[in-house]
A protein has these predicted regions:
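Bacterial N-terminal signal peptides that target proteins for export
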Residues: 1-11
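C-terminal motif of bacterial Sec signal peptides marking the signal peptidase cleavage site
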Residues: 18-22
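N-terminal secretory/targeting leader peptides
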Residues: 24-133, 148-370
Length: 370
């Protein structure tokens, strides 16, 4: 019944999306202003974990805020604050929880010290791809679990974007075996960082705004961030030359929209539906943007900045997969919420993998002539 109610609201709001966003331009803005003048105007603050105007992630938050305003006819306006403007990047969750901001935009693995199970809702090493993750969230019980673990913090989560499969990271030396990870200080948050710890590396959790300086000054020896589109914008090629793939640690990283529970529930039903549709549209649009932008950015990195593109050895990936499986089992055993989420995640992963082995993987191999 809950799903039917949500779907009916989404359908109504989707019609508003088409009529309002399709207009665009100054005429659309005038309509928004007129509607706002005739209705109560609600003003929200959105805190983010991203640098100001950062491509894909930061701009994704800004676009989401603009669409909420347009779709609501100016009744709900959201002002976006980049990391550090209102609160530090890694304090965005707390700001939304206590009501300092009504909305947040970040990644759930940043709050692992507060909510260990939250890490599963950004990404899991060797886990679900972006599309598989969305399917688990909307049709496999993932969203309900996500909402449940945030209840004690008065926060409502929603998936608000995904850059897709990431790169394996930037290094100043070749990585040929597990021995090369020994003592390596690498920026890698979430479960991937715990896997690194198991193989002898030193994981460091840094927000995006601090990565370049840390890598350039030697505070860290290596880093992963997102992929070519974002990594080029950050200038990471100036601090390291070896660029490894695949991104075993982040096969699809969900970006998270956070809502203060009291603020969200105070909205009328139609505004709640508008917000949900806007977030769901942002979730898909980010993947579209990154998929369209990554390859040209990668060519720029390799051809213009002499970045050395390297593939992790197969035996190294197998060892990391083994360490990842052990890490996930240990995490689940230590925390009841993590156990519940992991069980659901693993069940869905096993099921969808069976299908993708004969569909996605088989097709990609055929397309490549293999």
């Amino acid at each position: 019944m809950r799903n039917l109610m949500v779907l009916s609201k989404l359908a109504l709001a989707a019609l508003l999306t088409v009529s309002l966003i399709a207009c665009g331009g100054s005429e659309s803005d005038k309509k928004v202003a007129t509607a706002a003048a005739n209705a109560e105007v609600i003003n929200w603050k959105m805190v983010t974990t991203w640098p100001k105007n950062y491509p894909g992630l930061g701009t994704g938050a800004q676009t989401l805020a603009k669409n909420i305003s347009k779709m609501s006819g100016g009744r709900l306006n959201v002002k976006v604050y980049a990391a550090g403007e209102l609160v530090p990047a890694l304090e965005a969750f707390d700001a939304v929880s206590r009501g300092t901001a009504e909305m947040g935009h970040g990644a759930s693995y940043y709050w692992k010290g507060k909510v260990p199970a939250a890490q599963f809702f950004t990404t899991v090493p060797f886990g679900l791809t972006s599309q598989e993750f969305n399917s688990w969230i909307y049709y496999g019980g993932g969203l309900q679990l996500w909402e449940e673990i945030y209840v004690p913090f008065n926060v409502i989560p929603m998936p608000a974007g995904n850059p897709g499969v990431q790169m394996g990271g930037w290094f100043n030396k070749e990585i040929n075996s597990l021995e090369d990870f020994q003592g390596l200080k690498m920026r890698m948050p979430g479960i991937g960082g715990e896997v690194l710890k198991k193989v002898g590396a030193v994981p460091v959790n840094l927000p995006g705004s601090e990565i370049f300086t840390a890598l350039q000054t030697g505070t860290i020896d290596a880093t992963e961030w997102v992929g070519p589109y974002n990594d080029l914008a950050f200038g990471l090629y100036k601090a390291a030359k070896y660029y490894y793939y695949p991104g075993w640690q982040e096969p699809g990283s969900a970006i998270e929209a956070l809502f203060n529970k009291a603020a969200f529930e105070a909205l009328s039903e139609d505004l709640q539906a508008i917000v949900r549709v806007a977030v769901q549209q942002a979730n898909q649009d980010m993947l579209n943007e990154f998929t369209a932008s990554n390859n040209s950015a990668l060519k720029t990195l390799v051809n213009e900045h002499n970045v050395i593109l390297k593939e992790f050895p197969k035996d190294l990936l197998a060892a990391l997969k083994k360490a990842s499986d052990e890490t996930l089992a240990e995490m689940a055993a230590e925390d009841p919420d993590s156990q519940r989420v992991y069980d659901s995640f693993k069940t869905f992963l096993d099921s969808v993998s069976e299908w993708h082995d004969i569909s996605e993987r088989s097709y990609i191999n055929a397309r490549a002539g293999e």
